[in-house]
Amino acid sequence: MRLPAPIADAYGVAIRCLIVDDNNLFLDAATELLAREGLEVVGTATTSADAIRRAEELRPDVTLVDIDLGYEDGFELAEALSDRVAADSSVILVSTHSEEEFGELIAASPALGFIAKTQISARAIRELLDAG
């Protein structure tokens, strides 16, 4: 079985992704799916503190952040990541909820955009990065 070519930026470098979610089953499934589609998943985190530490350490091109991180707020994490991580890193919010439920909060956040968890793919991420 042939693996897909890595999903790359404009310079041909594979896109590096950090995934933040409090659900380990989702982390495993998303990691496997995105890696199979050619994205380089460089790490995962289950809490805001861990996400900030991992983002500073790993310097991903994009961080997928669950809006509902258990007792934590994904919107606050998106703000913190934007403030603390280099400007060349983007945040994309994800959720099992629809974009319409959080439309105003998503628009007001520093996140590049939103992808429903059921729609996560390397292509959807690439499209948001290209549009951003």
Set out the residue ranges of the language-model regions.
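Non-catalytic signal-transmission and effector/linker regions of two-component phosphorelay proteins
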Residues: 1-16, 120-132
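Two-component/phosphorelay signaling modules centered on CheY-like receiver
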Residues: 24-43
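Active-site residues of response regulator receiver
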Residues: 66
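The feature encodes the CheY-like receiver
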Residues: 70
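Short amphipathic alpha-helix used as the core "switch/output" element in two-component signaling
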Residues: 75-87
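Hydrophobic/aromatic residues positioned on beta-strands within the core alpha/beta folds
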Residues: 93-95
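Acidic catalytic/metal-coordinating carboxylates
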Residues: 47-50, 73-76
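As written
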Residues: 74, 106-113
